Design a protein with these regions (language model features):
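Alpha4 helix (beta4-alpha4-beta5 surface) of REC/receiver domains from two-component response regulators
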Residues: 59, 80-95, 108
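The short loop immediately C-terminal to the conserved phospho-acceptor aspartate in CheY-like receiver
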Residues: 49-52, 79
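Active-site beta3 strand of CheY-like receiver
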Residues: 40-46
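Acidic catalytic/metal-coordinating carboxylates
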Residues: 29-32, 55-59
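Conserved phosphotransfer cores of two-component systems
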Residues: 38-40, 64-70, 91
Length: 115
């Protein structure tokens, strides 16, 4: 999970606490997320869009999709306008979800891609 908000990262981690087959890695911004992506080679990436630094969620998504490990990317944002969703999908997102998301929503999304 890539999000600059520590509470969101904690909520995602706790959502998967009972899912023994899921290991959650956390990054605080797009740069750290991209580095972690290359180190860990995850099965799926959940990322916020609006983050500080040089790499936002849209750029992160594009870079992941351009890599050899084209894992699914779920963009999660407070921005829910159709134009925002279109930008996310154009960046290569497999799913675009608007915050807030329930733990069961997160689990269902991940299971759809990793089952």
């Amino acid at each position: 999970v890539v999000d600059d908000n520590a509470l969101i990262r904690t909520l995602v981690r706790l959502s998967f606490k009972r899912q023994s087959h899921v290991e959650v890695f956390e990054a605080v911004d797009g740069s750290e997320g991209l580095k972690l992506f290359h180190e860990v080679q995850p099965d799926i990436v959940l990322s916020d869009i609006m983050m500080p630094g040089e790499i936002d969620g849209l750029s992160l998504c594009k870079q992941i999709k351009a890599s050899e490990n084209k894992c699914p990317v779920v963009l999660i944002s407070a921005k829910g306008q159709q134009s925002d969703i279109d930008l996310g999908m154009a960046a290569g997102a497999d799913v675009y979800k608007v915050k807030p998301l329930s733990p069961s929503d997160l689990i269902l999304i991940v299971e759809n891609f990793t089952a």
